Amino acid sequence: MDVADLPGVPEWLPDHLRDDGIEELYPPQAEAVEAGVTEGENLVASIPTASGKTLIAELAMLSSVARGGKALYIVPLRALASEKQADFEEFEQYGLDIGVSTGNYESEGGWLADKDIVVATSEKVDSLVRNDAPWIEDLTCVVTDEVHLVDDGERGPTLEVTLAKLRRLNPDLQTVALSATIGNAEALATWLDAGLVDSDWRPIDLQKGVHYGQALHLEDGSQQRLSVQNNEKQTAAIVRDTLEDDGSTLVFVNSRRNAEAAAGRLANTVRPHLSTEERDQLADIAEEIRDVSDTETSDDLADAVADGAAFHHAGLSRGHRELVEDAFRDRLVKVVCATPTLAAGVNTPSRRVVVRDWRRYDGSAGGMAPLSVLEVHQMMGRAGRPGLDPYGEAVLIASSHDEVDELFERYVWADPEPVRSKLAAEPALRTHILATVASGFARSRKGLLEFLEQTLYASQTDDSGQLERVVDDVLTYLQRNDFLEIEAGELDATSLGHTVSRLYLDPMSAAEIVDGLRDWERGASDSTSASGSPADAQAEPPANSGFTTASELAEDADESDADRDPDDISALGLYHLVSRTPDMYQLYLRSGDREEYEMELFEREEELLGPTPSEFEEGRFEDWLSALKTARLLEDWATEVDEATITDRYGVGPGDIRGKVETAQWLLGAAESLASEVDLDAARAISEARIRVEHGVREELVDLAGVRGVGRKRARRLFQAGITDRAQLRDADKAVVLAALRGRRKTAENVLENAGHRDPSMEGVEPAPDVSVDLNDGADGDASAESTANDDQASLGDF
């Protein structure tokens, strides 16, 4: 189909597409147009990577906006939101306004009301619906990317419920769902009342195969000689062979440690193939990487990149990941060793893809388990860059003849698995049932079940009784913890329930926080956790359990004569409290950690909020220690321990630190609101702990670190130079500020301007010679420097 023949699109679009080199649509795109995607029809497009899904989305959204509507593009990851924002901003030259929102789950996003196209994560859209964002009802088109992720146990239920709510709010809403090739695309189309484009067409050929011995065995039965030289690993041989043909390679491995180790080894393979110009450019990129953060991870990445290799995983900071992705797309970095996060939609294709590890550790299986066909096919789909490569090759690694046959049967010739809803799990339903009632989507048990009948889960199961049983268990839990009132089948969210829904908390997290704060304030030694499972909540609590609902607590708060001073709550106690909630991904206990944190617990147990589980409660006690380890990381961050020490001490990457800090910041903010809701006097202590962990500083630096552009390291330098708060910075001697900031004029000007200095210009100013600061970290890689206006809250699960 010629772009001139597109129906229903803005008149400027055909010329715009031609300017981008697009004269005719790909076959799947033409099928989508024939199915009515530019005329408001619902559509599911299940097609391979790089087959034109983004243009299908753009056709749907732009035609909807041309009819006077408003479009929403839902992405699974924050990184994808930034990428799509950059893509769609091309349309601003034609008068369209693009907005992106991925954080601040308490906001209704009023500023998005005037945007023509909004890009957001599914969690953000869910929170907008909960907070009654009025512009949601103005939507005429919603596109959801990677819709096959409804199969994901953690994020899938949110996407599923959010789509169901949007379709109920806007009965005429056009829904376009983009998916990888899956085994049951027709089931998604049926659920969404949509037409279906189900195609395996690709713009360039993809050859799949298995490497073993001295040959690459391809799916058509042919063999290609690919020799392994003396002492050379198979992966290195494949990378070398690709380099000799001027190609790039993506290597997928099963852990962060393996990604880093493989990149270090493959750098030796790449180095001899680099030109002098490439070496110089890579050296500059390596220095940029070192500037992002002063950590061992940053140094290891910079060393690899200098030699044309890189690793990529969720433990890297956003700055690291963007530098790696850009260098790979620019063909400077020749090989990237990645965990499967890179296969989740970020646009980084390569000539060859090597799936080195097809098993990974699975705690539920008690050991190593094979990857799904869908995951492996997603990785393989990254092979081949349209317009750059004549073909793409995807290679699995076999260690024996038998394994060659197994890999062909398991992955090369196999069809992807069907996607299945994960909504019926109790943790997912806890959150979404409360939100559904609090936002008015259901006001009775019957209405709740009717709403859930609109989900994918309901369309995939014949056992409605199972859903009813789980729903009733969850309703009992929510009632027992004072989140819902239930009378004669009618459901009403309590004030606390509304607050929890607005804060985007798992109700179990809220129960844990309220109970922990209550335990501290009342000084009770016999209280029990309010975070038992819904099944446990069916039984009446024992008479001596100390269980008190939040409403009862509010009535009793003034009557207790055994209260502790709420200002005595330690930061560690609060960090531990939020670290043991379901909304925080705890650090694992490594070998040898248990003894260390048992000793830590013995020494600091009095600071913790709530009763410590018995050592005989193996699972709960282990979780308690894991939460303590996580809390200690947060405490280190808030007491200005440098990032390099934290990454080494806890075995994490810079991105992990940022993730834990942002999640703790959000949960502590929620704890402040909960404390006020149930009349607990801990808000001031919680606020201080939140601000300190937000900026990563001790108490005396809180005011300084709050100045935009300062951050933890610069705040300490300014403090040591005698500038102790924002007011002093506003009136400070510019020479002293310049010296404290190590002569960086632009940085000093920005800091002074943000502090409100009457004349922030550094023209003609020299650093004061008598100012010295006792910091030898060598980098200004404050975590805060990585944030932008759009990064006010981390999207949970991205880390």
From Swiss-Prot:
Residues 522-566, 750-799 are annotated as: Disordered. Residues 34-200 form the Helicase ATP-binding domain. Gene3D superfamilies: 1.10.3380.30, 5' to 3' exonuclease, C-terminal subdomain (1.10.150.20), P-loop containing nucleotide triphosphate hydrolases (3.40.50.300). Residues 234-435 form the Helicase C-terminal domain. Its EC number is 5.6.2.4. InterPro entries: DEAD/DEAH_box_helicase_dom (IPR011545), Hel308-like_dom4 (IPR048772), Hel308_SKI2-like (IPR050474), Helicase_ATP-bd (IPR014001), Helicase_C-like (IPR001650), Helicase_Hel308 (IPR022965), HTH_61 (IPR046931), P-loop_NTPase (IPR027417). A motif (DEAH box) lies at residues 145-148. The keyword Isomerase applies. DNA-dependent ATPase and 3'-5' DNA helicase that may be involved in repair of stalled replication forks. Belongs to the helicase family. Hel308 subfamily. This is ATP-dependent DNA helicase Hel308.
